[in-house]
Structure formats: C-alpha cells, structure tokens
Amino acid sequence: MKVLLYTENEKILSKSGLGKAIKHQMNALKAVNIEYTTNPKDDFDIAHINFYGLKSYRLAKKLKKQGKKIVYHAHSTEEDFRNSFIFSNQVSKLFKKWLIKCYTLGDAIITPTEYSKKLLQSYGIKNDIYVVSNGVELKNFGHDEKAGREFRKKYNFKKEDKIIVGIGLYIERKGIIDFVELAKQMPKYKFIWFGYSPLIFSRKKVRKAVNTKLNNLTFAGYVEQETICQALNGCDVYIAATYEETEGITIIEAASCKTNMVVRDIPVFNGWLENGKNVYMARNVSEFKNKIEEIVSGELPSLVQEAYNIAEERKSENIGEKLKNVYQGCLN
C-alpha cells in the first residue's frame, strides 16, 4: 500500500500546528512501514488530504473521478476558525460550508478528537469519521534537564527564575491576550511566548497584546522544534490558555517532556485530560494565576508522570497503526 500525503502550501503551513501534524503523519507511516509520497503525480493507492484549499478540493474531485479512494483529514472546524484573524468571525459560516464541501469528498474522514468528531457530525456530515490523534514523536520530545539548561542560557534566564511558557500563533483564540494579562499580574515570573503570524492579519486586541512592553514578557517568535523541546524542559509551567482546539499538539508534547502544565477547561479536552489527575485546569486569568503559583510553590503535587501516559498512548507507532486501519478499511 502506498499513500499520497497531500498538503498544498506546505511551506507556508509548516510553521503552524497543521504543519506539525503532517510531519507526525509521515513519521507515523514510517513507523509501521507504509510507503508514502507527497507528489500527486506519483503512483499511489489512496490519497490522504490534509487541507481545505482550492487545490486540495480540485485534486480530491479529480481523484474521485479516477476511482481513487480518499481520506480527508479534518484538522479545522468553524469553531476553531472563529477568533483567529481579521474578519474570521464575519466569514465563519461561509468557511463552515466550504469545509463541508471539502470533507464530504472523503471516503473516510479523520479528525483528532471525539470533540471534533461531534462538531463535524453536528454539521450534518454523514461520512464515516474516525478519531486519530495527531500524535507525538517521543524521541524528539522527552524529559531532558540538559535541554532545559540550554533554554535558560539561550534566553538569558537565571537558574532561580520562574518561567511560564505559552505557544501558538498570534491569534486571540490561542489565549495570547490572557497570557499578557498574566504577565502583568505576576511581575516576579518570567513569561515567554513562542510562535508567530503576521500582525497585519491579527485583530486589534492581539496587536495591542503583542506590542505590550514588560520587563518579564518575551515574544520569541517562530522557533524550530528543538527549541520548543528545550523550552518545555526548561520552564516551570507550560500554560495552554487556548479557547478552542481540535486537539492541541503542544499539550501532548508538554506531556512527553514531563512538563508541569495548566490548560484551559474547554470541551475538546473532555475524556482525555482530567483536572487534578493528569493536568491542572483553569477557566480564567484568576484561576490560571492561582494554579501557576500553587504548582511553583509545591502546594499542588506534580502530575507529570500521569501526563506522560497521554503522550505514550499517542506515540507514532500507535498512530501509524490507526492510520493503516483507516486506509485498509477504505480499500477493502
């Protein structure tokens, strides 16, 4: 069996969570010895399409006419499109209609969580929908004290500094405004945000947040995977202040690095993240502040070993087997 992993604008998307998810797919298929190509002109048995762009839609239509089987990967929903870029809320209903048009071309649809599956079903999509996590590369994200020290050295943090990390594009949905507010309220802590997107496309509130000047706040921009791993090992707490996700890859990576974390209590995490069991959860800035202080002071016990089980369940080999089962189901 040979799979076409197709993603238009791959270079542009490479710096996003979607780009990371596609790399994970490649590693997952390698882990279970499934051959793949990224060139639609090559011979292949089944197409796995990762994006909702016009090129992807046209390719899917063309392959359907040729009798090829298609797996469409639903990484995006109307819900996680909202509160992202300028005018995203105004056009979200049109975006949803377009997603439905694309996704329903699949003989099967893959989406990362039960939550995103329910959203797709609420759109009226009747195609078979399979839940497969985006997964994590355990060999690239692991507990590494040396990597943590390198992170602190690289960004001029002292050994005694208490560091809070956030990761994501410059969009409101990712909780970047709350991250800046936490930095304002917690001047004794160091806050550093990794990730970047052009501010020209960001909403006014986000631009204001990113341009905030505080002695304890750093916007480090886009960095490579190695630096993210170092940061997750070198920080005291990783916070996922996101308001909406289809999964949240960085949470799985933080779990793999055995990083203390606080995540927002939102529906996508129901069923696999549990407050006080494998992560700590918060609903607003005040609760994030309290949880961070209690983790750093030791009032709250560390849950990193319990969180690691999340990553272990989502390692490449397991994801590869699930992808293989979906492909075989379409081809048989």
Where are these regions (language model features)?
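Nucleotide-activated donor-binding/catalytic signature segment of Leloir-type glycosyltransferases, i.e.
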Residues: K204-E226
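Aromatic "clamp/platform" in nucleotide-sugar-dependent glycosyltransferases that forms part
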Residues: Y243
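Conserved acidic donor-binding segment of nucleotide-sugar-dependent glycosyltransferases
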Residues: N275-S286, E293-E299
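Conserved donor-binding/catalytic core segment of Leloir-type glycosyltransferases
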Residues: K158-K174, V180-K184, I192
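Short hydrophobic beta-strand element within catalytic cores of glycosyltransferases
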Residues: N260-V263
